[in-house]
């Protein structure tokens, strides 16, 4: 098949029946405004034209989903990552987990995130419970996301489930990095930790990315600490502020050396 033919087939992924209801996992036609799951009756919410295919915890505020303009735009096809370049060039179906405000456009690329950082996302989805069928994708990549997942081992299993036999995965995640990001920073990964997460995959290769100097790490810590103190000072009285600054300073000092 010609490359254009492959791309055309990949571009029609919305009509291939790979989307699943986030509540009951039944086959879900690509949802539009007013769509409902024929099996459980779940109404599919649309946020700025993007379908919300994730479940919610009791009391979770839906307005937290809309984070448009809170992240700078980037284009993952211009980062010089060989895996990403080869996956996009293959014409096969590619899933990006935690796409954020990725400006990359490809007919074979399905971009998801738990929050609406961009209206260019295919859908909002929880990486711990992906709304896709088994064996749906040929390639999966995730850039600077795994440190923000509360159960990365569950996400690794979800990737394994939705990946076709012979498929491939690329995960770029933090090792020596201070607390950062929205809404949470849970884990930094060692080589052995990453291997353990993906120990049910046939082949796992771990490599180190460019080293971040101590000066850069320190600058990041100082900048974050300033923003933390500024936010607390604006939100509380002077007496309360003094108490909270001491606590934040202690916590941040512990994070910096642990």
Predicted regions and their residues:
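Conserved N-terminal segment of class I S-adenosyl-L-methionine
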Residues: 2-130, 135, 139-143, 153
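Glycosyltransferases and closely related glycan-assembly transferases
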Residues: 85-86, 161-164
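Short catalytic micro-motifs in class I SAM-dependent methyltransferases
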Residues: 144-148
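S-adenosyl-L-methionine-dependent methyltransferase catalytic module, highlighting the catalytic core
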Residues: 153-154, 158, 168-258
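Short, well-ordered coil loops that connect the C-terminus of an alpha-helix to the N-terminus
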Residues: 30, 90, 165, 200-203
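Conserved short hydrophobic interaction patches
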Residues: 139-140, 162, 197
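Residues in and immediately flanking transmembrane alpha helices
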Residues: 126, 160-161
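Helix-to-beta-strand junctions that scaffold the AdoMet/dcAdoMet cofactor pocket
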Residues: 149-150, 163-165
């Amino acid at each position: 098949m010609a490359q254009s033919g492959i791309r055309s087939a990949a571009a029609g992924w919305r009509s291939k029946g790979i989307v699943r209801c986030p509540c009951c996992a039944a086959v879900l036609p690509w949802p539009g405004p007013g769509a409902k799951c024929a099996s459980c009756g779940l109404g599919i919410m649309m946020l700025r034209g993007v379908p919300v295919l994730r479940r919610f915890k009791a009391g979770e505020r839906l307005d937290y989903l809309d984070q448009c303009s809170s992240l700078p735009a980037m284009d993952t096809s211009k980062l010089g990552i060989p895996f990403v370049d080869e996956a996009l060039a293959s014409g096969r179906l590619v899933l990006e987990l935690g796409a954020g405000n990725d400006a990359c456009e490809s007919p074979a690329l399905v971009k998801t995130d738990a929050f609406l950082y961009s209206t260019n996302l295919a859908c909002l989805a929880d990486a711990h419970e992906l709304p896709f069928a088994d064996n749906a994708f040929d390639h999966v990549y995730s850039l600077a996301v795994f440190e923000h997942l509360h159960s990365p081992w569950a996400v690794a299993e979800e990737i394994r489930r939705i990946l076709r036999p012979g498929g491939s995965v690329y995960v770029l995640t933090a090792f020596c990095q201070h607390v950062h990001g929205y809404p949470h920073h849970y884990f930094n990964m060692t080589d052995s930790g990453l291997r353990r997460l993906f120990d049910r995959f046939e082949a796992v290769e771990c490599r180190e990315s460019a080293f971040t100097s101590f000066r850069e790490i320190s600058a990041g810590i100082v900048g974050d600490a300033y923003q933390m103190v500024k936010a607390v000072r604006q939100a509380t009285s002077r007496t309360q502020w003094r108490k909270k600054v001491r606590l934040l300073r202690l916590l941040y000092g512990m994070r910096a050396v642990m």
